[in-house]
């Protein structure tokens, strides 16, 4: 029930906002040309009455019309919607001036400027009311949302819900150092007081698509990499494509998703069976990004929109400054960070994070049974800046603030929640394959297959996904691209006759020969391309190859090989540096229908803990070697402990389902 204190607090907030908005209008009247408030002779401030009336009516119209306009514009992507918020503000200001003509503007554009500046000022004041912390600002919104729910007599389940927060790309070892160094005080407090921190181990394909498919839907079988080729359909599947992700879900409808009952999916690649989705790639429709109503709810608050805009601008200038600093100090390894990347970074670290976090806040107040959210900012910046450099850790600190904010909301929610924090994979660092050896994996394969010199090898169509420099991360790129245009329906393969298709996912490469039927074995590959396998296995950037053979698949290394079925090693074991579970990972992938003709495991240098990605990324993931294969899991100490060791995304799914069923009435 609403207390007198709550009502008084809301009334004070309203009066402060109204009065400060009126004062802002008086100041703008004096410093801006093109805007004139009516004057009165009855007050010391002649323009005060007009300012009070204008501020009140503009605020009331904002409250009434803004949510409607945002829902109407939810059919466009959040980036374009973001621009639309400013146009909407101008329209509301024009309507205000028409209804209460207490001010005059010289030009139409002046009304848009006035609306934007007034909204910006009220955003600042709203934040000041709740102090300067994002947590306090969100808690102010929580009070308002909870008031509306209680006014509507909405009932909240009393059984504990489950909140899963994924920090994309954060490795176990990086997190432990961050906790020790004070980079993540929120997570540190969680681990030291109420939760436990453990590592888990990914499948061979250590990337978000494979992990989330396993964690959210219970199976990532037949997923060899972030992108792969289907010889039957001549189609390249890629996890940044909504149609492909939807197909992956349809293939798993026999398994109830983690979020199937009263669940919510926020910022993920997949729904997990949830019907309520915001920023979910598999539910993108044109540019709606799956659940337009979800992010339009966020933009329905003009203060939120302006807070996000200010932070995006700050993130853009921060990226430009940090990129120049890397070049000036000649910090290596590094990759180009121009083009659209600064905007993708701002989208991933600010816009996507703000929208997803705000949606989770709403979920917690409504009392949803299970919520899974992916915070992608660290992963995006780590790809281009490095896995533990100061600028990357600064982003991690901000995500820690988001986690703290959500924990604070949990404390305010009517329904109790158990909170789990996890990552989908880590990242490994190092100069790229192209930087080290002067050619891409695709160029190397074509050169060896055709016995041509490097200068004669041209860039081919199939390299555009795997080898183009300055490629943003999967999640950030996919979301941002869909914000301004409809995503493509996939890649259809049209390689020249006899030429291989080469795809890359971190330091995992996939080589297909479309002209060879089925899965080509060593004999077929050698007959079609003599010397290719020898050239690849002897290359310093290639750690091992997985290929089919008449007697069973084999792993080939520079000085030895492993029988996949029996595990028998001849010569030096090329998997020895990849960890004790490397053969099991390879064996599982070898059973997939769409495993590549040649699976290429990039070299891992244990002395420096580095890999050489087949993509232009400083921090990479997708294969084996280094911290990329060891993410983390933080869980409440009063829950049953997961298996130790915990191997594979499907095993994590089983653990989360068990915790979900303990916590909620499933």
Predicted feature residues:
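His/Asp/Glu-rich, glycine-adjacent segments
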Residues: 135-140, 218-386, 507-513, 517-519, ...
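Active-site-proximal N-terminal segment of extracellular/periplasmic enzymes that hydrolyze or transfer
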Residues: 138-195, 436
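A long, amphipathic alpha-helix that forms part
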Residues: 350-351, 355, 371, 378-419, ...
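Metal-dependent active-site segment of extracytoplasmic phospho-/sulfohydrolases and closely related
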Residues: 400-438, 554-556, 561
């Amino acid at each position: 029930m609403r207390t007198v204190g709550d009502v008084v607090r809301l009334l004070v907030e309203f009066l402060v906002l109204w009065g400060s908005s009126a004062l802002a209008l008086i100041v703008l009247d004096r410093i801006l040309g093109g805007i004139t408030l009516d004057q009165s002779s009855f007050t010391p401030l002649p323009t005060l009455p007009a300012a009070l009336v204008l501020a009140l009516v503009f605020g009331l119209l904002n409250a009434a019309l803004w949510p409607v306009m945002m829902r109407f514009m939810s059919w466009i992507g959040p980036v374009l919607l973001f621009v639309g918020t400013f146009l909407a503000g101008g329209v509301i200001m024009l309507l205000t001036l028409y209804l209460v003509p207490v001010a005059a503007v010289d030009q139409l554009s002046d009304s848009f400027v006035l609306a934007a500046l007034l909204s910006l000022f009220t955003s600042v004041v709203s934040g000041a009311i709740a102090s300067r912390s994002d947590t306090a600002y969100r808690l102010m919104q929580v009070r308002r949302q909870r008031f509306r729910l209680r006014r509507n007599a909405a009932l909240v389940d009393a059984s504990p819900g489950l909140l899963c927060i994924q920090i994309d790309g954060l490795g176990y070892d990086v997190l432990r150092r961050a906790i020790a160094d004070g980079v993540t005080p929120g997570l540190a407090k969680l681990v030291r007081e109420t939760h436990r921190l453990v590592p888990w181990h990914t499948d061979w394909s250590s990337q978000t698509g494979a992990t989330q498919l396993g964690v959210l839907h219970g199976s990532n079988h037949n997923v060899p990499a972030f992108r792969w080729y289907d010889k039957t359909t001549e189609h390249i599947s890629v996890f940044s494509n909504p149609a492909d992700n939807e197909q992956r879900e349809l293939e798993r409808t026999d398994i109830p998703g983690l979020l199937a009952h009263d669940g919510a999916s926020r910022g993920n690649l997949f729904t997990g069976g949830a019907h309520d989705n915001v920023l979910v790639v598999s539910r993108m429709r044109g540019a709606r990004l799956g659940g337009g109503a979800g992010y339009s709810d966020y933009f329905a608050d003009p203060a939120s929109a302006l807070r996000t805009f200010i932070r995006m601008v700050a993130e853009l200038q921060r990226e430009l400054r940090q990129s120049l600093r890397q070049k000036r100090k000649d910090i290596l390894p590094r990759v180009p960070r121009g083009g659209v990347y600064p905007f993708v970074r701002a989208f991933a670290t600010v816009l996507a994070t703000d929208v997803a976090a705000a949606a989770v806040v709403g979920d917690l107040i409504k009392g949803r049974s299970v919520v899974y959210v992916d915070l992608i900012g660290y992963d995006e910046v780590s790809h281009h800046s490095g896995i533990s450099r100061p600028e990357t850790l600064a982003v991690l600190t901000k995500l820690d603030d988001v986690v703290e904010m959500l924990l604070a909301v949990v404390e305010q929610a009517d329904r109790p929640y158990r909170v789990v924090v996890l990552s989908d994979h880590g990242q490994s660092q190092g100069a790229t394959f192209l930087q080290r050896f002067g050619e891409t994996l695709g160029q190397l394969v074509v050169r060896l297959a055709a016995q041509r010199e490097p200068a004669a090898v041209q860039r081919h169509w199939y390299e555009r996904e795997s080898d183009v420099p300055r490629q943003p991360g999967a999640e950030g790129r996919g979301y941002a691209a869909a914000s301004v245009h409809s995503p493509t329906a996939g890649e259809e393969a049209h390689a020249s006759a006899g030429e291989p298709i080469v795809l890359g996912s971190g330091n995992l490469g996939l080589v297909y020969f479309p002209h060879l039927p089925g899965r080509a074995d060593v004999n077929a590959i050698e007959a079609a391309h003599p010397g290719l396998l020898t050239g690849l296995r002897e290359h310093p950037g290639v750690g091992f190859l997985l290929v089919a053979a008449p007697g069973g698949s084999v792993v080939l290394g520079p000085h030895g090989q492993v029988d996949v079925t029996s595990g028998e090693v001849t010569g030096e074991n090329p998997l020895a540096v990849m960890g004790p579970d490397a053969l099991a990972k390879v064996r599982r992938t070898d059973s997939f229908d769409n495993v590549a003709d040649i699976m290429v495991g990039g070299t891992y240098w244990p002395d420096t803990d580095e890999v050489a990605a087949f993509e232009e990324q400083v921090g990479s993931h997708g294969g084996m070697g280094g911290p990329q294969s060891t993410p983390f899991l933080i869980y409440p100490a009063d829950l049953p402990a997961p298996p130790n060791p915990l191997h594979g995304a499907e095993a994590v799914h089983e653990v989360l389902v068990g915790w979900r069923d303990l916590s909620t009435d499933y």
